[in-house]
Amino acid sequence: MRDETAEQPAPLRSGLTTGSCATATSLAAARLLLGGVVADAVQIVLPKGKQVQMRLEFCRLTKDGAEAGTIKDAGDDPDVTHGALLYSRVQLMAEPGIRFIAGKGVGTVTRPGLVLPVGEPAINPVPRKMISDHLTLLAEETGYRGGFEVTVNVEGGEALALKTMNPRLGILGGLSILGTSGIVRPFSCAAYIASIHQGIDVAKTNGFLHIAACTGNASEDTMRRVYNLPEIALIEMGDFVGAVLKHLRKVPVDKLSLCGGFGKISKLAAGHMDLHSRHSSIDLPQLAEWAAAIGADDTLQQAIRGANTSQQALAIASAAGVALGDEVCRHALEFARSVVPAQVQVEVFAIDRQGGIVGHAGAFV
């Protein structure tokens, strides 16, 4: 019998951004209008020069222009738009230039603070440049002197957008057309981190200088209850506390409230910037040391070290009258203050699974 060895996991597959999809479909539709070419695939150049070919679902003339569509393939990334049909409609204009329109399922900017002005379709700068560059080159190749009106659509985009940060950012009516490299890196979470940064930018631009960064729904509810903060001031950071703290170096606010489950706050207290279990773990011996610093005896410390979960460790300490929640928040506060600018006032809340506050450190002046 042969020895069994663990299989090597297959490498994760990269995908292409909505910006790449919009570029490919716009180019195919424009090429049909200017050259009569009905394509089933189209090749585009990504921002760093790599050429990729994308398969088209359709490429056809319409009453007043042409349209082409492709299925968004995010590779192995758990992207909300994976498998969605993205299609672009192109009309020719007499005057040179590119005019962008938000079609079905693509949002419109309604709040200041984003990279696009209020009223603009949520087609980000890099996708706009990609589309413009490809259509400009096509015009030069065909001798066309006019311009293009490009309407980007995502089938079902209105519903998909509700699963993103767009409504909170003031991007209404659908999704954003995104991408800086044209490529989706599996589990890079780049889009999520970008939405955290945008959330801070939008809050500050709209005059909200006290923000609460929360790990999930329960912590958001706690911050609403404690401060009655509006939606725009609540930053859904998930596990990416580092994305919040580092961005505040560039875009400082007056006050930052950090709120999360006790276990995640204990990871922050230990100096972790990514609170996901893939990148950091609960350190029960460290919890025992912190408990010792505020009076836990040897028996209690041993019980904390032997706990099954951070919540159990907290319950053991609380039953003994040791305020472990506050002590963990104090260490988390110290670490957070070491990252953000000195002018940013910081406080930290730890909550239980029901949203009850089990620890707090820091007080606003």
From Swiss-Prot:
Keywords annotated in UniProt: Cobalamin biosynthesis, Methyltransferase, S-adenosyl-L-methionine, Transferase
Pathway: Cofactor biosynthesis; adenosylcobalamin biosynthesis; cob(II)yrinate a,c-diamide from sirohydrochlorin (anaerobic route): step 6/10
Tree of life domain: Bacteria
Gene3D superfamilies cross-referenced by the UniProt entry: CbiD-like
SUPFAM superfamilies: CbiD-like
Cysteine disulfide partners in this protein: none
MF (Gene Ontology): cobalt-precorrin-5B C1-methyltransferase activity
InterPro entries (UniProt xref): CbiD (IPR002748), CbiD_sf (IPR036074)
Record's catalysed reaction(s): Co-precorrin-5B + S-adenosyl-L-methionine = Co-precorrin-6A + S-adenosyl-L-homocysteine
EC top class, as a word: transferase
EC numbers: 2.1.1.195
Keyword Coiled coil: no
GO biological process: anaerobic cobalamin biosynthetic process; methylation
Coiled coil: none
Similarity section: Belongs to the CbiD family.
Protein known as: Cobalt-precorrin-5B C(1)-methyltransferase
Source organism per UniProt: Pseudomonas fluorescens (strain Pf0-1)
Taxonomic path: Bacteria, Pseudomonadati, Pseudomonadota, Gammaproteobacteria, Pseudomonadales
